[in-house]
């Protein structure tokens, strides 16, 4: 049974509290399941909506690997970068996400950084303007449920 938006958000908050001190690889597996197996957000791994650990080429080396890329109809929509949930946002985390957004093979306008909070970035490639929304992991948070 599919959850409504508030139920799905509250489930994520409960899970986050359980896994707050886990290492980044555990956090990544959990979020992969949230996007895929649980289908909390309406995406399907089977349909190719979710790409995990896809390598982005720079020169002759595969160096950049976003944690998750969400697609609709085989078109990349946004990238998700995951960090340990107990870690605060840092400039290097933000730079890493913005590097993915501006990568020539992606050039995406939206990125999500998940650490102690969820940060949603809107990046205007034409003027370099960045707007971000900060969403704390709080039960019944209206921004989280959206």
Give the positions of each predicted feature.
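A short, conserved, highly charged catalytic patch centered on acidic carboxylates
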Residues: 1-110, 120-146
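Short beta-alpha junction loops
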Residues: 114-118
């Amino acid at each position: 049974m599919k959850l409504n938006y508030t139920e799905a958000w509250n489930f994520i908050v409960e899970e986050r509290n359980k896994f707050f001190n886990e290492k980044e690889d555990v956090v990544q597996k959990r979020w992969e399941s949230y996007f895929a197996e649980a289908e909390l957000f309406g995406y399907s791994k089977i349909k190719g909506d979710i790409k995990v650990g896809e390598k982005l080429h720079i020169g002759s080396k595969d160096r950049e690997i976003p944690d998750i890329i969400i697609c609709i109809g085989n078109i990349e929509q946004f990238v998700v970068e995951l960090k340990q949930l107990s870690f605060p946002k840092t400039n290097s985390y933000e730079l890493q996400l913005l590097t993915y957004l501006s990568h020539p093979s992606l050039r995406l306008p939206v990125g999500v950084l998940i650490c102690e909070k969820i940060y949603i970035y809107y990046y205007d490639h034409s003027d370099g303007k960045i707007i971000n929304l900060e969403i704390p992991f709080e039960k019944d948070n209206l921004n989280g449920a959206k």
